[in-house]
């Protein structure tokens, strides 16, 4: 990757990441207000939404061949990278353990992983359907 492409990629990732992080904040805030702090609905929601959209975008970007790299940087690496959050997932598991709600750790991880896999596959299926030439 030459220097110009590298800098363009960095700019696209930063742009997408800023928007994705802001979107994560908005979704998390809305769900916290709506459902309270008993369960990390915001993190679960952004990770599942991100899984679905990532599956869709992977197919959509791949259909564009070499012209898809800017979209991959902006949308997958930047936007979805900023939207989803593994570190928050792990931190929330630690909070459950420290508050003696260890059973919630297993439930939360199972829901996140199982539905995350389901959503990424559903997104990819939708992407294949929509982008089918």
From Swiss-Prot:
Catalytic activity reported: fluoride(in) = fluoride(out)
GO biological process, one term: cellular detoxification of fluoride
InterPro entries for the chain: FluC
Sites where the protein binds Na(+): 81, 84
Regulation: Na(+) is not transported, but it plays an essential structural role and its presence is essential for fluoride channel function.
Keyword Nuclease: no
GO cellular component: plasma membrane
Subcellular location as annotated: Cell inner membrane
Keywords, comma-separated and alphabetical: Cell inner membrane, Cell membrane, Ion channel, Ion transport, Membrane, Metal-binding, Sodium, Transmembrane, Transmembrane helix, Transport
One Gene Ontology term of the molecular function aspect: fluoride channel activity
Topology class, membrane: Multi-pass membrane protein
Residues that span the membrane, as ranges: 3-23, 41-61, 76-96, 103-123
Pfam family, one: CRCB
Family per record: Belongs to the fluoride channel Fluc/FEX (TC 1.A.43) family.
Function: Fluoride-specific ion channel. Important for reducing fluoride concentration in the cell, thus reducing its toxicity.
PANTHER family registered for this protein in UniProt: FLUORIDE EXPORT PROTEIN 1-RELATED, FLUORIDE-SPECIFIC ION CHANNEL FLUC
Protein name: Fluoride-specific ion channel FluC
